[in-house]
């Protein structure tokens, strides 16, 4: 009977491994046999931006445990860097069934959704971190998750928080965040070309939308148009960014300002479009996380979130309205009009000039 290494990092179990396909190796005398040092499961299902800003954990675990095998469960597999993660699973019935019977050394759930917490409860692991299902709700699996959990329950605790998101999730896992970067594929290998971008100029991207959930974040389109005009007058190439939801808005801003708008694209192509920019002006959105993941300069407009939450990695600046926001983590302004109208174009423009000079 043919011998095989069940603990080898390359072994798939259902198909031939890469060393066999490329070199014909068999397990008995395989020169590249690599014993798995740790099996690690990360459950991070939710919003694309939150998935991106959880990726610094990968580098830390790779450094701690060379030859570890990392499995990641998510709703959006396409956003994860395939070359950095051994097994990427989309959250569905098949993946949930598999994981309930798999075994790990470390299992982490960073989502408070009940299905994610229930899965961590069911997973077999020597160490568990984050949230599990207790009394039919998501609760901390241990005291390490208490801080992050409490910031999600009490607004005053969240407003007093001085830790950024990565510091919080690292602490949940018993780790210390040391500025590890986001990991994101720029999709440069896909052959995307952008002939309509003037590369002789510094390219400033304006990410104009903010999604449906937190509309209090939205900067008025007239303000974006005014900023675009000032940047164009200064000699920058101004590129409007957004998805299908922002298409009509971006067309209007283009018509008002003369900024460049190329349309909306599938996610990998949109990521590559952002990669063409030197700096991006954005609200707190997926586009913000993509910008940081691509290591671009950034001017971040924020009103309803604790600014301590965001690590810009020394490549940007946060600008806020001139009056205090009273709608902390609210999707709609309780005063009837968002304070983003109190964030003047001149303030954002001056921040762009400072950051581009970094």
Segments predicted by a language model, with ranges:
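Catalytic machinery of carbohydrate-active enzymes
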Residues: 1-358
């Amino acid at each position: 009977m043919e011998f095989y290494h069940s603990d080898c990092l390359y072994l798939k179990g259902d198909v031939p491994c890469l060393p066999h396909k490329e070199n014909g190796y068999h397990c008995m005398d395989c020169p590249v046999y690599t014993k798995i040092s740790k099996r690690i499961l990360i459950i991070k299902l939710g919003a694309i931006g939150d998935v991106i800003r959880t990726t610094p954990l990968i580098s830390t675990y790779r450094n701690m445990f060379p030859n570890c095998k990392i499995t990641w469960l998510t709703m959006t597999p396409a956003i994860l860097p395939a070359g950095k993660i051994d097994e990427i699973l989309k959250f569905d019935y098949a993946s949930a069934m598999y994981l309930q019977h798999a075994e790990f050394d470390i299992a982490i759930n960073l989502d408070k959704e009940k299905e994610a917490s229930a899965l961590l409860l069911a997973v077999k692991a020597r160490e568990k971190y984050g949230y599990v299902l207790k009394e039919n709700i998501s609760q901390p699996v241990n005291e390490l998750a208490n801080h992050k959990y409490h910031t999600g329950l009490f607004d005053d605790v969240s407003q007093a928080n001085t830790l950024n998101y990565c510091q919080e999730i690292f602490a949940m896992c018993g780790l210390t965040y040391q500025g590890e970067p986001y990991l994101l594929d720029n999709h440069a290998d896909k052959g995307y070309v952008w002939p309509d971008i003037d590369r002789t100029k510094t390219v400033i991207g304006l990410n104009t939308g903010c999604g449906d959930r937190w509309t209090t974040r939205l900067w008025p389109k007239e303000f974006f148009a005014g900023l675009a005009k000032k940047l164009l007058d200064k000699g920058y190439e101004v590129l409007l960014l957004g998805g299908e939801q922002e298409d009509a808005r971006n067309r209007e801003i283009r018509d008002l300002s003369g900024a460049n708008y190329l349309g909306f694209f599938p996610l990998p192509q949109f990521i590559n479009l952002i990669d063409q920019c030197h700096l991006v002006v954005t609200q707190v959105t997926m586009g913000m996380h993509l910008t940081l993941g691509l290591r671009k300069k950034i001017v971040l407009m924020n009103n309803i979130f604790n600014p301590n939450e965001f690590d810009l990695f020394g490549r940007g600046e946060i600008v806020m309205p001139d009056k205090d926001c009273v709608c902390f983590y609210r999707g709609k302004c309780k005063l009837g009009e968002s304070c983003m109208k109190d964030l003047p174009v001149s303030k954002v423009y001056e921040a762009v000039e400072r950051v581009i000079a970094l």
